[in-house]
């Protein structure tokens, strides 16, 4: 597991021992005995240097050919404690005893990127239920997934775990019900009670479980909308409950599954929905805001009117975190404003085109230009700004591939010509 990673294994290896060492020498020793010692030995070349190992399939490895000797020497320098990265200043993490360190190693076994299931599938039902009560969310999730792969899973033990005094067991029961999806329907009322618990993570996991159960749990939607709209700056300053409820209710799929209200808002209390949407559009996470976008296409133009100022605000004021995914709600908002012929969408679209996250902007820019072009001749007023943006894309944008810069500039200039030739002047509506 250490030898893989979303961006390759370079960072996983670089920060492995400096991270493990925060928990003391017993943790370091256990990790080296399990993995580090043999891995480091095999990684060293005949001349003493350490090249980047790379993934098993090296196609497209952007770190190929790197000399990683310094990263490995950083690990070997841990006992010297000469710099802060190697322990010059004592850390604040609890120092693990030998037994605790070994227990952590055991928790990590039974999984590899090439074979994620076989070890857990060999465990008995009792062993899997025991692992649902683990301190580790990773172990709990793997046990839950293994249970869900079985044809018959008893629900009463999960109901009992949901009422346990041990929070980890309650988390694990929720995780199992998430994996079981509709088969977890008998737990709806117990999960519903968990929505009122004081523990933040328990409320979140209970909400995720209800969303995963799906249609049988639709009766809980009013409570979930109410929870989403709640703001608790003291106990939840980053709005994590709100974040996960955005996914549970509105997400279009992916790791969080399809939200309960993603496809239809029929029968949903409009007052509760509007409150939840307004709150979600202010969440600090761009990905959570993005989930709200499904609402835009499930409401009529008339029903959307009270929400338009909030939708506009979510376009012009980006989320402070989750930047990689923050474009979704902004582009969807611009698309909606154009569909409804909202005048403010013109300026907002141009400003976002210039200020957008460069990541994947070569794909996003044509979308934005298509949105702008739908305003027809009304967009002629922003041609001077578009001209500057095209020049910026072609000549000034930093740290972006030249061929993609030219591609974006060409797209903007083609849009300028199309706007200049446009004779369409749809009637526009002002927000204010």
Kindly give the residue locations of the regions a language model identified.
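Terminal, non-catalytic domain-edge segments
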Residues: 11-14, 18-128, 410-432
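Structural detector for internal amphipathic alpha-helices that build alpha-solenoid repeat scaffolds
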Residues: 18, 22, 108-120, 138-152, ...
């Amino acid at each position: 597991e250490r030898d893989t990673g979303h961006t390759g294994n370079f960072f996983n290896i670089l920060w492995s021992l400096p991270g493990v060492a925060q928990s003391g020498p017993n943790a370091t020793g256990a990790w080296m005995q399990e993995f580090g010692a043999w891995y480091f030995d095999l990684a060293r070349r005949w001349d003493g240097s350490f090249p980047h190992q790379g993934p098993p399939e090296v196609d497209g490895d952007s770190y190929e050919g790197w000399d990683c000797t310094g990263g490995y020497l950083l690990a070997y320098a841990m006992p010297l404690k000469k710099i802060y990265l190697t322990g010059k200043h004592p850390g604040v993490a609890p120092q693990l005893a030998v037994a605790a360190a070994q227990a952590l190693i055991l928790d990590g076994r039974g999984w590899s990127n090439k074979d994620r299931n076989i070890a857990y599938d060999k465990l008995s039902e009792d062993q899997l239920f025991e692992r649902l009560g683990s301190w580790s969310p990773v172990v709990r999730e793997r046990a839950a997934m293994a249970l869900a792969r079985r044809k018959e899973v008893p629900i009463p033990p999960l109901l009992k775990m949901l009422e346990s005094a041990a929070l980890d067991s309650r988390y694990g029961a929720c995780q199992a019900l998430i994996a079981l999806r509709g088969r977890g329907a008998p737990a709806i009322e117990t999960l519903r009670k968990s929505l009122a618990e004081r523990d933040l993570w328990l409320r979140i996991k209970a909400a995720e479980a209800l969303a995963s159960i799906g249609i049988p749990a639709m009766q809980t939607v009013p409570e979930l909308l109410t929870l989403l709209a709640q703001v608790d700056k003291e106990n939840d300053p980053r709005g994590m409950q709100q974040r996960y409820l955005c996914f549970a209710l509105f997400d279009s799929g992916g790791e969080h599954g399809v939200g309960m209200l993603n496809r239809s808002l029929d029968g949903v209390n409009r007052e509760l929905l509007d409150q939840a949407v307004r709150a979600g559009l202010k969440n600090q996470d761009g990905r959570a805001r993005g989930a709200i976008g499904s609402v835009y296409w499930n409401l009529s133009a008339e029903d959307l009117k009270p929400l338009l100022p909030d939708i506009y605000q979510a376009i012009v004021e980006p989320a402070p975190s989750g930047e990689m995914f923050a474009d979704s709600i902004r582009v969807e908002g611009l698309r909606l404003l154009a569909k409804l012929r909202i005048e403010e969408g013109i300026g907002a679209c141009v400003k976002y085109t210039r200020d957008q996250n460069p990541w994947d902007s070569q794909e996003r820019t044509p979308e934005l230009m298509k949105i702008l072009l739908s305003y027809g001749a009304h967009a002629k007023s922003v041609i001077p700004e578009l001209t500057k943006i095209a020049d910026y894309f072609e000549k000034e944008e930093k740290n972006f591939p030249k061929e993609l810069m030219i591609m974006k500039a060409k797209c903007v200039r083609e849009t300028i010509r199309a706007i200049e030739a446009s004779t369409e002047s749809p009637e526009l509506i002002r927000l204010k």
